[in-house]
Amino acid sequence: MWTPTEEEKYGVVICSFRGSVPQGLVLEIGETVQILEKCEGWYRGVSTKKPNVKGLFPANYIHLKKAIVSNRGQYETVVPLEDSIVTEVTTTLQEWASLWKQLYVKHKVDLFYKLRHVMNELIDLRRQLLSGHLTQDQVREVKRHITVRLDWGNEHLGLDLVPRKDFEVVDSDQISVSDLYKMHLSSRQSVQQSTSQVDTMRPRHGETCRMPVPYHFFFSLKSFTYNTIGEDSDVFFSLYDMREGKQISERFLVRLNKNGGPRNPEKIERMCALFTDLSSKDMKRDLYIVAHVIRIGRMLLNDSKKGPAHLHYRRPYGCAVLSILDVLQSLTELKEEKDFVLKVYTCNNESEWTQIHENIIRKSSTKYSAPSASHGLIISLQLFRGDMEQIRRENPMIFNRGLAITRKLGFPDVIMPGDIRNDLYLTLEKGDFERGGKSVQKNIEVTMYVLYADGEILKDCISLGSGEPNRSSYHSFVLYHSNSPRWGEIIKLPIPIDRFRGSHLRFEFRHCSTKDKGEKKLFGFAFSPLMRDDGTTLSDDIHELYVYKCDENSTFNNHALYLGLPCCKEDYNGCPNIPSSLIFQRSKESFFISTQLSSTKLTQNVDLLALLKWKAFPDRIMDILGRLRHVSGEEIVKFLQDILDTLFVILDDNTEKYGLLVFQSLVFIINLLRDIKYFHFRPVMDTYIQKHFAGALAYKELIRCLKWYMDCSAELIRQDHIQEAMRALEYLFKFIVQSRILYSRATCGMEEEQFRSSIQELFQSIRFVLSLDSRNSETLLFTQAALLNSFPTIFDELLQMFTVQEVAEFVRGTLGSMPSTVHIGQSMDVVKLQSIARTVDSRLFSFSESRRILLPVVLHHIHLHLRQQKELLICSGILGSIFSIVKTSSLEADVMEEVEMMVESLLDVLLQTLLTIMSKSHAQEAVRGHCPVTAEITGEYVSCLLSLLRQMCDTHFQHLLDNFQSKDELKEFLLKIFCVFRNLMKMSVFPRDWMVMRLLTSNIIVTTVQYLSSALHKNFTETDFDFKVWNSYFSLAVLFINQPSLQLEIITSAKRKKILDKYGDMRVMMAYELFSMWQNLGEHKIHFIPGMIGPFLGVTLVPQPEVRNIMIPIFHDMMDWEQRKNGNFKQVEAELIDKLDSMVSEGKGDESYRELFGLLTQLFGPYPSLLEKVEQETWRETGISFVTSVTRLMERLLDYRDCMKGEETENKKVGCTVNLMNFYKSEINKEEMYIRYIHKLCDMHLQAENYTEAAFTLLLYCELLQWEDRPLREFLHYPSQTEWQRKEGLCRKIIHYFNKGKSWEFGIPLCRELACQYESLYDYQSLSWIRKMEASYYDNIIEQQRLEPEFFRVGFYGRKFPFFLRNKEYVCRGHDYERLEAFQQRMLSEFPQAVAMQHPNHPDDAILQCDAQYLQIYAVTPIPDYVDVLQMDRVPDRVKSFYRVNNVRKFRYDRPFHKGPKDKDNEFKSLWIERTTLTLTHSLPGISRWFEVERRELVEVSPLENAIQVVENKNQELRALISQYQHKQVHGNINLLSMCLNGVIDAAVNGGIARYQEAFFDKDYITKHPGDAEKISQLKELMQEQVHVLGVGLAVHEKFVHPEMRPLHKKLIDQFQMMRASLYHEFPGLDKLSPACSGTSTPRGNVLASHSPMSPENIKMTHRHSPMNLMGTGRHSSSSLSSHASSEAGNMMMMGDNSMGEAPEDLYHHMQLAYHNPRYQGSVTNVSVLSSSQASPSSSSLSSTHSAPSQMITSAPSSTRGSPSLPDKYRHAREMMLLLPTHRDRPSSAMYPAAILENGQPPNFQRALFQQVVGACKPCSDPNLSMAEKGHYSLHFDAFHHPLGDTPPALPARTLRKSPLHPIPASPTSPQSGLDGSNSTLSGSASSGVSSLSESNFGHSSEAPPRTDTMDSMPSQAWNGDEGLEPPYLPVHYSLSESAVLDAIKSQPCRSHSAPGCVLPQDPMDPPALPPKPYHPRLPALEHDEGMLLREEAERPRGLHRKASLPPGSVKEEQARLAWEHGRGEQ
């Protein structure tokens, strides 16, 4: 049975549970659970992670923990009973876990590993806390480490800062806001300190300890590597100050054996010392670690003699130094141990041994020897900081290693009271000794003993250095042969204090012989007592001691024999009569020592001894007291208690005589303890006063003297002694109070009234001193300052003798006596406030009784200072302390009164102060940036204000509001507090991560607003309505709801729950307040329309549904009120749209916001009660329509916002912007917003360097302006100016952008428009400039090369696309050099989630509605709108190139497909063309690089119609070319004509036209298609026409052919006869051919019949210039039948059966084989290698080597564009089928066949032809080609092939040289043929910038020398073919293909562009605006030699689908005329 648990309430999961039982709760190890019930080994409860899910789990899976249960029952809460910091570590680690993993995902690897390390440390520290084995100090230290790491991690992860007190998280409810603010500051500083890793030697920021913290150097000797000494050695280490030239520390001694190891085996790894008590000043000294090496052994190291084994001498060997500054630079952390190597240098001269370390430091290399490489001391150093106890506690391992404490010589900066020292440091300086009759100098050794008064040698009183035990004797080192040795060794003498008096030192001098015996002979001694007769110790000085002669036989047993002798010169003066019969006689030798005493018990000061023994000198007492000031502080603190006892004894002895002197001495000693060096002796003083002071009568004299000093302060000029007495006030009162207590005890409280009276009088004197005007007396000012500083320190002493109220009255009177801030200087202001601050912080102020007395005077002073804006930081500190005390005392009844007092005194002035500070802060940030001081002051006062408001309750607010005398006062107060609150939220006073502080602030604000809103409603509605106050209130509410800290949606769920549990959702609270106040406005709502629409709209952007639901009705209300007032709600509408735009652009709003205004729509429908006030139904309809528009606007704005804030591509951003811009213009007619987005779009184009688009975009704004002088306001970046000026500036900018975009044709009309304006204003300077600009644009058009862009159709399908793209299709203008493959890759990179569709079919609904992204991309061909320019023969191709691809709105692509059964022998019977024409919304180029497709038209072209178009286009091309030669427009050679004729005739002979005959002239076809009779007749007429044209062509060719080319001509005649014969039966009239064609011809039989049909096994390649280019750019096929299907027949290539999917290299190889293989001779006549997967309109002539992975090659007999519909059998072979556009006017790639090789080389003719063509086909950069492919020449030879054995002879050598003649196109049958004199390899937009006028290598015949004149543009003139003259000029030749093609579309209407209409010709009959039409007369009819009359008509050709009605005639001329005119078509 399940029973509720009593004790088992909380536990931790120790084993994961899968919840495999019914109602089982899934648990993971480490989770915590709250247990509700138990039953037989099972628990029922919840996981704290998911508190809403209850379940079962095994009891043995849970580790129970103690917990505190509150509110037992169904809603009980359980808190684990554990250390709060353990709980915090647990929750923090859980929060960090997910964030830590994200760091790795975001590639923040460094922080990832750092955080992992910190998390492991926290886990370990938490484990230590839980162990329960730590001491309190250790627990505190562990907590400190934990908090540092927690704060560090939170800081780096961007989490909230946690305020702490004593390492515990504080509860914001339990402390004042001021304290909370200070804790945040403290936590921030500790985080910054732990993060910054600054130089850790510096004092930490924020340390409040006044004591200097000492440093300590840990030293460890690792090894001494040497091989040359071979003897034992002593190494002494010490710290040396190079600047002072002295040693500052004791020596650390290490004894080493001859191997370099410690002599004592126990010292291994324990040769370490701690150099202690180094001050900050010491660390700045030029310190060195100096090591002196003393060897112990033979006298001479290189002496081979073996001396006596028992005699060892201490001999100097070497020295090493290390700079401490270098150490400090390398030690980056305090506790980092680092190794160093010290090189040991040896001394060259032993006499300079004492200076060797200085010489090494100075690098005096001549005085020491460089060390051997093997010599070196390896040491490690570590720097510590802190007191010794702390170091010992933090580093126990170091102190366990036998650490030698090495102290400073002398006392440290801080002398600790318990530090007992009695050390005498003695230095053996030098000696001067006689030679003693010896020839060499002595080797002197000094031996020293310490002897007691009885002659006993003191044991262990000599220390050579720390680290080794003390000894009883000392032996100096020996300097070889030196009678004036200098030792410089420092010996420490730790003599017990009780043995010091009477002890003396004895120095014995011995000569150490180097002879065999090695004796040490005593020759003298010296001595020195340690204390003088007057009781002082040996002074710290150098002492010269007398040396007395003696020998080894002398005895020192009776020390009295020599102690009576003078030891030194000073002593000699005291012993004038020395008998000469003494045993010891003084020699002339001398010995020098120096001493330094560091003792806390002994003194060297005579004056101090005199004071302590004052009774011995009664007549000198006044002098002794006066000289006390000259005693050093160290001596005074050492004997502090004795001195104080002496002073008070003297005071009791004679008060009147010595009272003032004792008082002054006491003041001196008290002030001495204020020195930081002796600060730690204050406890000694306190202990003395409490336990040892016995002056019961002293208080009387002390009060008297103190009062006398104060009374004299107004008269005396020098007041140094008075100021010292004021500074000593604290301890003087301690003595006074303790003395009075002692007296009261002794007398049972006698003289109490006298004492109280004296204190009263003393305070009167104090008040007198403070009331004096010190503005003119600096001395008095210092006295007052000293008094005020000390005054708060006496409160605790007074409380021992007086009640709290009495002391408070004393203090109030004193503080009240101070002059106001107006009458004192600034420095005194500071001191006064500091005194008040210390008063507030004192224990006295914590009593409510005293606060009631003191608070008014404190508030009075603060109020005055705040009014004057003086010392704001100190005032804020005082207020913070007051609020802190009030908060802690908030349970007391008196607090209500105190808060009331503060509200009356402070609230208003606090608000005013904050407003002033905030305005200054704002101004400073604007000028100088963030100011930390100003920010700190602002934060302090904000926390004070919040503290006060938090303490206020209903009563306080009610009293506050009732106390206002008028509504104006109330209004002023409300405006102030609302303004402060607004600034609080706008200025971000508290940092972002101070979440606790921010939430508390918000809670206080919303509570305060709730109190004040009723006053606002009550006082400022109806007749007293005040817009300013209400507006301020609404603005505050809006700002409050929008605060980032309140947006709970972006924080973790745990944190959100915590906030909601504590505060609730304060946004909802404020929203309800806002709505309520709005409803209270009544008819005054109209005042806030439209002003508050934007702010309220901002509130709806908060992603909180309840807030949105509250706010939406307000908008309906606004619309309703404006409708009532104005009859419409245009203002609401305009403002709503404007604010929506700006806010969403700033990144606000979310996805659910799209549906927000749907809520508003409901208000017009389901709730008719809301419409009762609406009188007309139209209001409802208008409202719904408006909301619908706003909703659509929201969709676009959010799309725009998402594009802009993300890393989206240029196309997306432009598309969003254009979409939004059009919406503003067309749907809601917001011109200003429209113009704003015009400029945004322009900026995007400029950034992407789309200058043409930028110009068109700006042109939209320009068109809105007129040439008027209407003034325009400042807008965007435009200044205030007239409309004329702005339009002029815009025009100039647009012209500049058109120029940069190379779109000069668009810029010229603007130039003309500006010129008209300048001319009308007679501004000739500007007119000159603009005309020059226009002229330069004409030059640029003619001279500069421009690339023709490609165009691509893109379909965006699926719901995942942005709104403006979804399920739409666009045509995009590609970038320069961009082909289809590159464009597709770009689109897929822009939409990485998109899938490229593999077919061109229109997608079905499943794709359109799916949640995915599909892209359908293929290339399309532009259809120019304007054709006049393109039809003119004399217009340069660079001009035409522009009009072919600009101002284009229609595009098309073709798709070949088979309809019906497919004939394997002739596929053209069923091959249809599906032609799609796309019409865009706008022309390209325009304001975007792409526009949406507005309309699409689909037409199917039958096979027969396709054949008609192919033959017709070839006929037009032939006529044009022949006409050029007849008019001698192409002079010199006739290669172009030769190749063109060869291509047509050869293709016809080898199966070209025959295929059409087989397909369409068959009886079966005619029977099955009776409706095609007319078209079949038309095709027959065109074939007949072609025969006639070929006949004329051959006649012209015969006339001009070079003799060497006669074999070719003969071959053409023969093949022509075969062609005519093959068509004889169909066209009976063909047997009557002109003599020119038949004279020399012999029929060869029906070649067509024997020719194998074109099958898939043969190579079939699509020619890119097929006649189906007719509607687009007029491209023609290379033979009459070379394109049964249009070259536009699709955008995918079709391959034959066997060539399907071949790589381009394979195709190329296949074609070469076809030309070399006799099987293919004559059949492969029209070969062109297609471009690759992006074979596109601008494929260049180099595209033959480009791959075609996405294309299919059709089985057509000649070039067709492939179909996107691949035959089923091939679908598997190509996964990617991209629709490609047809090629526009580009020369195709040519591939010349290598027919017959002459000795491995091509025949002469082909060799020459290759040179000619290659010259014209320079390598260029085709964007379709890869880099590897761009290096190849790709030649296109359309059906130019010579049968075997019929090769013409080679051209003469002279014809191979270069000639400036016209080039030929890459293909002899290319659409530019002979007329295109300017035929370009790049054709306008080819990529390499090669000139469009390619060179030709064709030479002239020998009869006609080559011309050197260049092409010109003179008008053409008639020329008779019979004349054998050169033409009088060389005309410019342009492609006939354009006029032929564009005739078909000439009649199509021209679309007006967004640019001015004069950019392009409007009427085809008028001259085009750019450029002007050249003179273009009609050509007269030309008579052919053979009588054939050819007539050129200027009329346009027939359309695509036309009926032919002319029957064939019987007369040849009529046939020729009819054939010639057959190109005229009907529209």
UniProtKB/Swiss-Prot annotation:
Residues 1676-1695, 1731-1751, 1877-1899 have a biased composition (Low complexity). Residues 1981-1998, 2011-2027 have a biased composition (Basic and acidic residues). It is found in: Cytoplasm. Keywords: Cytoplasm, Guanine-nucleotide releasing factor, Phosphoprotein, SH3 domain, SH3-binding. Residues 1225-1632 form the DOCKER domain. Disruption phenotype: DOCK3 knockout mice show sensorimotor impairment and structural changes in several brain regions, including the spinal cord and cerebellum. Structural changes are consistent with central axonal dystrophy and include a disorganized cytoskeletons, and abnormal accumulation of autophagic vacuoles associated with impaired axonal transport. Common features of mutant mice are gait abnormalities, limb weakness, ataxia, and an impaired ability to swim. Disulfide bonds: none annotated. This is Dedicator of cytokinesis protein 3. It comes from Mus musculus (Mouse).
